[in-house]
């Protein structure tokens, strides 16, 4: 059976993607924030220990929380960079796509 992992698959567009894949009999793991936090590389690596192979991978996590630009700190920028780039790169380098 074809397997899929949908990050951000518990609501919104990700949930719609998950439901669409399920409707064509694909075995879907819909990952939520509690399953993986792409801004935290320890969380990403822990996720990859369990979910290290799939046929389909959808990278659909949410973005940073809204905040006035003037209030964004260097720490925030590092978190956003991890969340939307480094976390995804780590996943892509370490997961086997069949």
Identify the role of each PLM range:
Residues 7, 54-62, 84:
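Rossmann-fold scaffold of SDR-type NAD(P)-dependent oxidoreductases
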Residues 10, 14-19:
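N-terminal Rossmann NAD(P)H-binding glycine-rich loop of SDR-like oxidoreductase domains
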Residues 11, 62-65:
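Flexible cofactor-recognition loop at the NAD(P)H-binding site
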Residues 31-42:
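Rossmann-fold cofactor-recognition segment
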Residues 41-54:
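Conserved amphipathic alpha-helix within the SDR
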Residues 58, 87-95:
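Hydrophobic positions on the long internal alpha-helix
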């Amino acid at each position: 059976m074809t397997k899929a992992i949908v990050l951000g698959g518990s609501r919104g567009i990700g949930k719609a993607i998950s439901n669409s894949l399920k409707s064509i009999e694909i075995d879907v793991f819909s990952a939520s924030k509690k399953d993986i936090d792409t801004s935290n590389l320890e969380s990403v690596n822990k996720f990859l220990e369990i979910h290290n192979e799939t046929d389909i991978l959808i990278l659909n996590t949410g973005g940073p929380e809204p905040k006035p630009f003037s209030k964004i700190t260097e720490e925030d920028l590092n978190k956003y960079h991890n969340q939307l780039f480094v976390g995804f790169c780590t996943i892509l380098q370490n997961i086997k796509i069949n």
